[in-house]
From Swiss-Prot:
Chain residue ranges for the region called Disordered: 49-72
Family, similarity comment: Belongs to the complex I NDUFB11 subunit family.
Entry GO CC: mitochondrial inner membrane; respiratory chain complex I
Alphabetical UniProt keywords: Electron transport, Membrane, Mitochondrion, Mitochondrion inner membrane, Respiratory chain, Transit peptide, Transmembrane, Transmembrane helix, Transport
Organism of this sequence: Pongo pygmaeus
Chief location: mitochondrion
Name of the protein described by the UniProt record: NADH dehydrogenase [ubiquinone] 1 beta subcomplex subunit 11, mitochondrial
Membrane topology classification: Single-pass membrane protein
Segment annotated as transit peptide: 1-29
Length: 153
């Protein structure tokens, strides 16, 4: 019921907009629940054609094709010599400096999450326990004699 009223009021709104010369959107809406379709009426489709005008691009004498002057242009400068030098500088700093020095920096970063240190510490502890005749691993992580438990109540 409500969807039908919505469709009716939408059609009236589109027709009123078309008769008054207001711009109406050409929208077709279909409800997924009640299968109501709202489409612009035939009145909305009868508009006067808009006047057509010839549009022509202004040709500025400043606009020039860089590829006519320099077919190997890289887009850095209008002058071919500066264009080549700017391209060489960009690629030198981009490839040589960033990639080479960047990968060197990453390679010499400190131990991430201390993985190497924990491995060395475990090897040192295993050597100490083997030298003193202790088991390599114990079930107790802490010495039970040093732990103070609360009294039973």
């Amino acid at each position: 019921m409500a969807a039908g009223l919505f469709g009716l009021s939408a059609r009236r709104l589109l027709a009123a907009a078309a008769t008054r010369g207001l711009p109406a959107a050409r929208v077709r809406w279909e409800s997924s629940f009640s299968r109501t379709v709202v489409a612009p009426s035939a009145v909305a489709r009868k508009r006067l054609p808009e006047p057509t005008t010839q549009w022509q691009e202004d040709l500025d004498p400043e606009d020039e094709n860089l590829y006519e002057k320099n077919p190997d242009s890289h887009g850095y400068d209008k002058d071919p010599v500066l264009d080549v030098w700017n391209m060489r500088l960009v690629f030198f700093f981009g490839v040589s400096i960033i990639l080479v020095l960047g990968s060197t920096f990453v390679a010499y970063l400190p131990d991430y999450r201390m993985k190497e240190w924990s491995r060395r510490e475990a090897e040192r502890l295993v050597k100490y326990r083997e030298a003193n005749g202790l088991p390599i691993m114990e079930s107790n992580c802490f010495d039970p004699s040093k732990i103070q438990l609360p009294e039973d109540e």
